[in-house]
Design a protein with these regions (language model features):
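Alpha-solenoid helical repeat scaffolds
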Residues: 14-35, 44-545
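Eukaryotic N-terminal, low-complexity and coiled-coil-prone scaffolding/targeting segments
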Residues: 1-13
Length: 545
């Protein structure tokens, strides 16, 4: 361990200090354990002695071991301790900064970023701003004010300008952000990160043609930068002009022959243009690229599935790993189930959970969705209870179990799981909406249900499923006019059989039977086997449409 520690040869040399016998024994035991490969024991001893002695040399060695072990919690504690003992230590400042960022304390982190800026490293100012996007509005505004105050004494520092522009963008102050990005271009015209930021802001502020032209030029000038290529592909696709995207990507792919990000974009453009053979040819080449092969196999699987070649689709989905593992596995499991091989699908998912423990919660969720789709509700509930034994408190698994319980009519279990989610995350819009909808559907606690749904809607004001829930609870309360307004809005945002079932029912109840039939008829054309619409028709005795 001591020879291989990544920081072992770069740290500051500290003079040997006399230690009490107990400390010396603990440190010697730690070094011996490290040589035997018992890194956890070595780290525990060094962290404990770093706390006890506060000695910078002990802290530095503890940091080396924590880095070797990849123990972020220990690194965070040691970084803060190091800064307390040696305020001018750059490595300690870096560790403290990223610890505070992980803890969601960006203004405290900015103190250390300022120190690093004064010592020649402004990069953390960019990273800090990039991680501020999810902050509450008041804390985000305070951080932006801090950046602006710092900029007064560093008016042309590119890292500070970049971070400030990001914060302004996040705050919706697009013109101010654009002005700073233009200043960055003047100071560093050939820096890819500046070009990317500036063109994205041009696009956001409506100068879409100018943004696309400048980003295309940047891609030509920096063929080695995949980030620019990926951004160019996204910007092209946002235009929703597939023919134009193909033309541009074919041109650039001929110039930047080694840029596989462009080729991947071209493959997707071919797919969207209903040119599967061209898409397949590109993707088969990209399947040889270590960075893109997983995504390539996933999309090859989709092409094969669309062509009805189930065997080939399954082969490709099996090869999709990394970030593509879960979506590919979900498709593969569905294909097996459609062939009547549900048991084989479940065995495959069980094997993957052993091989990819870090992905096990998602794999449990895929299996539960499969069981619910096949109407094995009790099995799904049992599986999710098992999964929560291995991953207690997992929000996605709790939510999935609530769905299974709802299918079984176990509303008490639904409420328990959704409230367990809200105990962890009171602003979880999905849980708020699901609980409100469940109460509206299966109880008379309508006011409580509406309050929960309105909280969800405040968090996601344009979510059609939440708007549908609000319409439904208003209907259950007898507020038919208000319910119709919300359900019509939901239907305009989302084509969905549940929304159609609800809208049709309210129309039917208010006497507009012809409009209700038209809504149901249109929905059944797209979803001919939807059980909710059929159950609604039967319950209302709506007769043949």
């Amino acid at each position: 361990m001591s020879q291989e520690s990544p920081a072992g040869d770069e740290g500051q040399d500290y003079p040997v200090q006399p230690f009490p016998t107990q400390t010396l024994y603990a440190l010697l035991a730690a070094e011996t354990a490290g040589l035997r490969g018992d890194v956890p024991f070595a780290l525990r001893n060094y962290v404990e002695q770093a706390r006890i002695t506060g000695d910078p040399g002990v802290i530095a060695r503890a940091v080396q071991i924590a880095q070797h072990a990849g123990d972020e919690a220990a690194l965070g504690e040691l970084g803060l301790l190091w800064v307390d003992r040696e305020p001018d230590n750059v490595q300690g400042r870096e560790l403290a900064l990223f610890t505070l960022l992980r803890q969601g304390k960006p203004r405290d982190a900015l103190v250390h970023a300022h120190f690093l800026l004064e010592n020649g490293d402004g990069q953390p100012l960019r990273q800090l701003a990039a991680q501020a996007a999810g902050l509450p509005a008041d804390r985000h505004a305070a951080l932006l004010t801090d950046y602006q105050a710092l900029a007064a004494s560093h008016p042309d520092d590119v890292d500070l300008l970049f971070g400030q522009a990001l914060l302004l963008w996040q705050a919706g102050q697009l013109q101010e952000a654009l002005a700073l990005s233009a200043q960055l271009i003047e100071l560093q015209p050939d820096e890819p990160a500046n070009q990317l930021l500036h063109t994205q802001l041009l696009d956001e502020t409506g100068s879409k043609e100018k943004a696309l032209a400048q980003l295309e030029q940047a891609v030509r000038e920096h063929p080695e930068n995949p980030g620019l290529s990926r951004a160019f592909v996204r910007m092209l696709f946002s235009r929703r002009d597939t023919a134009f995207a193909i033309e541009k990507l074919e041109q650039l792919s001929r110039i930047n022959r080694g840029d596989n990000s462009l080729r991947f974009g071209l493959a997707l453009a071919y797919r969207d243009a209903s040119l599967p053979e061209q898409a397949r040819a590109e993707l088969e080449l990209l399947a040889r690229d270590p960075e893109l092969r997983n995504d390539a196999h996933f999309h090859l699987g989709q092409l094969a599935e669309a062509a009805g070649d189930t065997k080939r689709a399954i082969q490709h989905y099996r090869h999709a790993q990394g970030a593509a593992l879960l979506p590919a596995t979900a498709r593969l499991a569905n294909l097996l189930a459609q062939q009547g091989e549900l048991t084989a699908a479940r065995l495959y998912l069980q094997e993957l959970r052993v091989q990819h423990r870090e992905q096990a919660p998602g794999l449990f969720q895929i299996e539960s969705e499969l069981l619910i789709r096949e109407r094995y509700y009790s099995s799904a509930q049992e599986l999710l209870t098992e999964s929560l034994g291995a991953f207690p408190g997992d929000i996605n698994l709790l939510y999935a179990r609530s769905l299974a319980s709802e299918k079984m009519g176990d509303i008490d279990a639904v409420e328990r799981d959704l409230r367990a989610i809200l105990d962890q995350d009171g602003d979880n819009a999905a849980a708020l909406n699901a609980l409100g909808y469940s109460l509206a559907n299966h109880s008379t606690r309508y006011e409580e249900a509406q309050s929960l749904i309105e909280r969800a809607l405040a968090l996601q004001p344009n979510d059609a499923s939440i708007i549908d829930s609000l319409g439904w609870v208003l209907y259950r309360r007898g507020l038919h006019t208000e319910a119709l307004a919300q359900l019509r809005r939901a239907a305009a945002l989302l084509t969905d059989p549940e929304v159609a079932a609800h809208l049709g029912e309210v129309l039917w109840t208010t006497g507009d039977s012809e409009q209700a039939r038209a809504v149901w008829r249109e929905a059944l054309q797209q979803y001919p086997d939807d059980p909710l619409i059929k159950a609604t028709l039967e319950r209302l005795n709506a007769g043949p449409l």
